Amino acid sequence: MIEFKNISKSYGNQEVIKDFNLTIECGTFLTIIGSSGSGKTTILKMINGLIKADKGEVLINDKNIQDEDLIELRRKIGYVIQGNILFPHLTVFDNIAYVLNLKKYDKKEIEKIVNEKMDMLNLSRDLKDRLPDELSGGQQQRVGIARALAASPDIILMDEPFGAVDAITRYQLQKDLKELHKKTEATIVFITHDITEALKLGTKVLVLDKGEIQQHDIPKKICSNPKNEFVKQLLKMAEM
Protein backbone atom coordinates (compact mmCIF):
# COMPACT_ATOMS: atom_id res chain seq x y z
CA MET A 1 0.00 0.00 0.00
CA ILE A 2 1.20 3.50 -0.89
CA GLU A 3 0.08 6.45 1.24
CA PHE A 4 0.53 10.18 0.80
CA LYS A 5 -0.11 12.05 4.04
CA ASN A 6 -0.52 15.85 4.02
CA ILE A 7 1.99 16.27 1.18
CA SER A 8 2.99 19.72 -0.08
CA LYS A 9 5.66 20.60 -2.63
CA SER A 10 6.80 23.90 -4.14
CA TYR A 11 9.27 24.82 -6.86
CA GLY A 12 10.46 28.31 -6.04
CA ASN A 13 7.38 30.36 -5.23
CA GLN A 14 5.00 28.01 -7.01
CA GLU A 15 3.21 25.41 -4.92
CA VAL A 16 2.50 22.44 -7.19
CA ILE A 17 1.12 20.02 -4.57
CA LYS A 18 -1.18 21.30 -1.82
CA ASP A 19 -1.99 19.26 1.30
CA PHE A 20 -2.27 16.09 -0.80
CA ASN A 21 -3.68 12.92 0.75
CA LEU A 22 -4.12 9.64 -1.11
CA THR A 23 -4.09 5.90 -0.44
CA ILE A 24 -3.26 3.45 -3.24
CA GLU A 25 -4.24 -0.08 -2.26
CA CYS A 26 -2.06 -3.05 -3.22
CA GLY A 27 -2.84 -4.37 -6.70
CA THR A 28 -4.47 -1.15 -7.91
CA PHE A 29 -3.86 0.06 -11.46
CA LEU A 30 -4.05 3.81 -10.83
CA THR A 31 -4.06 6.11 -13.84
CA ILE A 32 -3.33 9.78 -13.18
CA ILE A 33 -4.55 12.48 -15.53
CA GLY A 34 -4.68 16.25 -15.29
CA SER A 35 -3.61 19.56 -16.72
CA SER A 36 0.04 20.31 -17.47
CA GLY A 37 1.81 21.35 -14.28
CA SER A 38 -0.83 19.73 -12.08
CA GLY A 39 1.78 17.72 -10.17
CA LYS A 40 1.40 14.31 -11.83
CA THR A 41 5.09 13.57 -12.33
CA THR A 42 6.00 15.11 -8.97
CA ILE A 43 3.63 12.69 -7.22
CA LEU A 44 5.00 9.74 -9.18
CA LYS A 45 8.62 10.58 -8.36
CA MET A 46 7.83 10.97 -4.67
CA ILE A 47 7.00 7.26 -4.55
CA ASN A 48 10.57 6.20 -5.36
CA GLY A 49 12.19 9.15 -3.60
CA LEU A 50 13.42 10.97 -6.70
CA ILE A 51 11.57 14.03 -5.40
CA LYS A 52 11.21 14.83 -1.70
CA ALA A 53 8.12 16.51 -0.29
CA ASP A 54 8.50 19.83 1.53
CA LYS A 55 5.87 18.72 4.03
CA GLY A 56 4.15 15.44 4.83
CA GLU A 57 5.03 11.78 4.44
CA VAL A 58 5.04 9.12 1.75
CA LEU A 59 4.65 5.61 3.15
CA ILE A 60 5.00 2.24 1.45
CA ASN A 61 3.56 -0.62 3.50
CA ASP A 62 3.40 1.69 6.55
CA LYS A 63 7.09 2.69 6.30
CA ASN A 64 8.17 6.27 5.62
CA ILE A 65 10.35 6.07 2.52
CA GLN A 66 12.70 8.73 3.91
CA ASP A 67 13.68 6.22 6.61
CA GLU A 68 14.57 3.65 3.93
CA ASP A 69 17.70 3.14 1.82
CA LEU A 70 16.45 4.95 -1.29
CA ILE A 71 18.81 3.19 -3.69
CA GLU A 72 17.60 -0.18 -2.46
CA LEU A 73 13.99 1.05 -2.56
CA ARG A 74 14.35 2.06 -6.23
CA ARG A 75 15.68 -1.37 -7.12
CA LYS A 76 12.42 -2.81 -5.78
CA ILE A 77 10.24 -0.47 -7.87
CA GLY A 78 9.82 -0.75 -11.64
CA TYR A 79 10.12 2.55 -13.52
CA VAL A 80 9.17 3.24 -17.15
CA ILE A 81 9.13 6.65 -18.84
CA GLN A 82 8.28 7.99 -22.29
CA GLY A 83 10.69 7.42 -25.16
CA ASN A 84 13.89 5.44 -25.34
CA ILE A 85 15.30 5.16 -21.82
CA LEU A 86 17.30 2.02 -22.51
CA PHE A 87 21.06 1.92 -22.08
CA PRO A 88 22.23 2.47 -25.69
CA HIS A 89 25.46 0.48 -25.31
CA LEU A 90 23.75 -2.59 -23.81
CA THR A 91 21.95 -5.34 -25.70
CA VAL A 92 18.27 -6.10 -25.19
CA PHE A 93 19.25 -9.00 -22.93
CA ASP A 94 21.56 -6.88 -20.78
CA ASN A 95 19.04 -4.05 -20.54
CA ILE A 96 16.36 -6.40 -19.22
CA ALA A 97 18.85 -8.12 -16.91
CA TYR A 98 20.27 -4.86 -15.53
CA VAL A 99 18.63 -4.88 -12.08
CA LEU A 100 19.02 -8.65 -11.82
CA ASN A 101 22.78 -8.25 -12.27
CA LEU A 102 22.85 -5.50 -9.63
CA LYS A 103 21.10 -7.89 -7.26
CA LYS A 104 23.65 -10.64 -8.04
CA TYR A 105 21.17 -13.14 -9.47
CA ASP A 106 22.59 -16.43 -10.73
CA LYS A 107 23.29 -16.47 -14.50
CA LYS A 108 20.88 -19.32 -15.16
CA GLU A 109 18.15 -17.55 -13.20
CA ILE A 110 18.79 -14.34 -15.16
CA GLU A 111 18.48 -16.22 -18.46
CA LYS A 112 15.22 -17.78 -17.32
CA ILE A 113 13.72 -14.48 -16.14
CA VAL A 114 14.75 -12.57 -19.27
CA ASN A 115 13.17 -15.25 -21.45
CA GLU A 116 9.96 -15.16 -19.39
CA LYS A 117 9.66 -11.38 -19.58
CA MET A 118 10.41 -11.28 -23.31
CA ASP A 119 7.72 -13.91 -23.92
CA MET A 120 5.30 -12.01 -21.68
CA LEU A 121 5.86 -8.79 -23.67
CA ASN A 122 5.64 -10.51 -27.06
CA LEU A 123 9.32 -9.84 -27.79
CA SER A 124 11.02 -12.36 -30.05
CA ARG A 125 14.01 -13.98 -28.37
CA ASP A 126 15.90 -13.29 -31.61
CA LEU A 127 16.14 -9.67 -30.41
CA LYS A 128 18.30 -10.51 -27.38
CA ASP A 129 21.61 -9.47 -28.93
CA ARG A 130 20.36 -6.32 -30.62
CA LEU A 131 21.13 -2.81 -29.42
CA PRO A 132 18.27 -0.36 -28.71
CA ASP A 133 18.82 1.66 -31.89
CA GLU A 134 18.15 -1.50 -33.90
CA LEU A 135 14.61 -1.75 -32.49
CA SER A 136 11.34 -0.07 -33.40
CA GLY A 137 9.79 2.40 -30.96
CA GLY A 138 7.26 -0.18 -29.82
CA GLN A 139 9.96 -2.79 -29.27
CA GLN A 140 12.00 -0.32 -27.22
CA GLN A 141 9.02 0.39 -24.97
CA ARG A 142 8.39 -3.33 -24.52
CA VAL A 143 12.03 -3.85 -23.52
CA GLY A 144 11.68 -0.98 -21.04
CA ILE A 145 8.61 -2.60 -19.50
CA ALA A 146 10.32 -6.01 -19.43
CA ARG A 147 13.25 -4.45 -17.57
CA ALA A 148 10.86 -2.83 -15.07
CA LEU A 149 9.20 -6.21 -14.47
CA ALA A 150 12.38 -8.30 -14.34
CA ALA A 151 12.85 -8.31 -10.56
CA SER A 152 9.09 -8.89 -9.98
CA PRO A 153 8.48 -5.53 -8.25
CA ASP A 154 5.34 -4.99 -6.21
CA ILE A 155 5.14 -1.41 -7.56
CA ILE A 156 5.58 -0.19 -11.14
CA LEU A 157 5.71 3.54 -11.97
CA MET A 158 4.96 4.60 -15.55
CA ASP A 159 5.24 8.21 -16.78
CA GLU A 160 3.51 8.50 -20.17
CA PRO A 161 5.22 5.33 -21.41
CA PHE A 162 3.23 5.15 -24.65
CA GLY A 163 3.38 8.83 -25.58
CA ALA A 164 6.06 8.44 -28.27
CA VAL A 165 4.63 5.48 -30.22
CA ASP A 166 2.13 5.33 -33.07
CA ALA A 167 -1.58 4.71 -32.47
CA ILE A 168 -1.56 1.04 -33.52
CA THR A 169 1.45 0.21 -31.33
CA ARG A 170 -0.08 2.18 -28.46
CA TYR A 171 -3.30 0.17 -28.68
CA GLN A 172 -1.40 -3.12 -28.55
CA LEU A 173 0.79 -1.95 -25.65
CA GLN A 174 -2.31 -0.91 -23.71
CA LYS A 175 -3.84 -4.34 -24.29
CA ASP A 176 -0.62 -6.11 -23.25
CA LEU A 177 -0.27 -3.97 -20.12
CA LYS A 178 -3.81 -4.75 -18.95
CA GLU A 179 -3.05 -8.46 -19.31
CA LEU A 180 0.26 -8.03 -17.46
CA HIS A 181 -1.51 -6.35 -14.57
CA LYS A 182 -3.91 -9.28 -14.27
CA LYS A 183 -1.02 -11.75 -14.27
CA THR A 184 1.34 -9.94 -11.89
CA GLU A 185 -1.17 -8.19 -9.56
CA ALA A 186 1.44 -5.46 -9.12
CA THR A 187 0.46 -1.95 -8.06
CA ILE A 188 0.80 0.25 -11.15
CA VAL A 189 0.82 4.06 -11.10
CA PHE A 190 0.47 5.31 -14.67
CA ILE A 191 0.54 8.95 -15.85
CA THR A 192 -1.18 9.89 -19.09
CA HIS A 193 -2.48 13.00 -20.89
CA ASP A 194 -5.12 10.88 -22.64
CA ILE A 195 -8.41 10.57 -20.75
CA THR A 196 -9.49 7.66 -22.95
CA GLU A 197 -6.31 5.78 -22.01
CA ALA A 198 -6.80 6.64 -18.33
CA LEU A 199 -10.34 5.24 -18.32
CA LYS A 200 -9.40 2.17 -20.35
CA LEU A 201 -6.42 1.07 -18.25
CA GLY A 202 -7.13 2.14 -14.70
CA THR A 203 -8.96 0.18 -12.04
CA LYS A 204 -8.93 3.60 -10.36
CA VAL A 205 -8.49 7.03 -11.96
CA LEU A 206 -7.06 10.10 -10.23
CA VAL A 207 -7.90 13.48 -11.78
CA LEU A 208 -5.63 16.38 -10.78
CA ASP A 209 -5.68 20.12 -11.38
CA LYS A 210 -3.29 22.65 -9.87
CA GLY A 211 -1.93 20.13 -7.40
CA GLU A 212 -5.32 19.19 -5.98
CA ILE A 213 -7.49 16.09 -6.38
CA GLN A 214 -10.58 16.78 -8.49
CA GLN A 215 -11.85 13.20 -8.42
CA HIS A 216 -10.57 9.75 -7.44
CA ASP A 217 -12.80 6.83 -8.30
CA ILE A 218 -13.35 3.83 -10.54
CA PRO A 219 -13.69 4.73 -14.25
CA LYS A 220 -17.40 3.87 -14.38
CA LYS A 221 -18.27 6.32 -11.59
CA ILE A 222 -16.13 9.09 -13.04
CA CYS A 223 -17.97 8.72 -16.35
CA SER A 224 -21.43 8.55 -14.77
CA ASN A 225 -20.91 11.15 -12.04
CA PRO A 226 -18.15 13.70 -12.79
CA LYS A 227 -17.63 15.81 -9.68
CA ASN A 228 -17.00 19.21 -11.26
CA GLU A 229 -16.61 21.17 -14.48
CA PHE A 230 -12.93 20.26 -14.86
CA VAL A 231 -13.72 16.54 -14.89
CA LYS A 232 -16.65 17.12 -17.27
CA GLN A 233 -14.36 18.90 -19.73
CA LEU A 234 -11.88 16.01 -19.62
CA LEU A 235 -14.67 13.54 -20.35
CA LYS A 236 -15.77 15.60 -23.36
CA MET A 237 -12.30 15.05 -24.80
CA ALA A 238 -12.86 11.28 -24.56
CA GLU A 239 -16.00 11.66 -26.67
CA MET A 240 -14.22 13.51 -29.50
Residue ranges and their predicted role:
Residues 48:
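Helix-to-loop junction immediately C-terminal to a conserved catalytic motif
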Residues 64-78, 83, 102, 222-226:
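ABC ATPase NBD coupling module
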Residues 108-126, 179:
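Conserved ABC ATPase "signature" region
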Residues 131-135, 139:
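Conserved ABC ATPase signature
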Residues 152:
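Conserved catalytic motifs of ABC-family nucleotide-binding domains
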Residues 216-217, 225:
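ABC ATPase "signature
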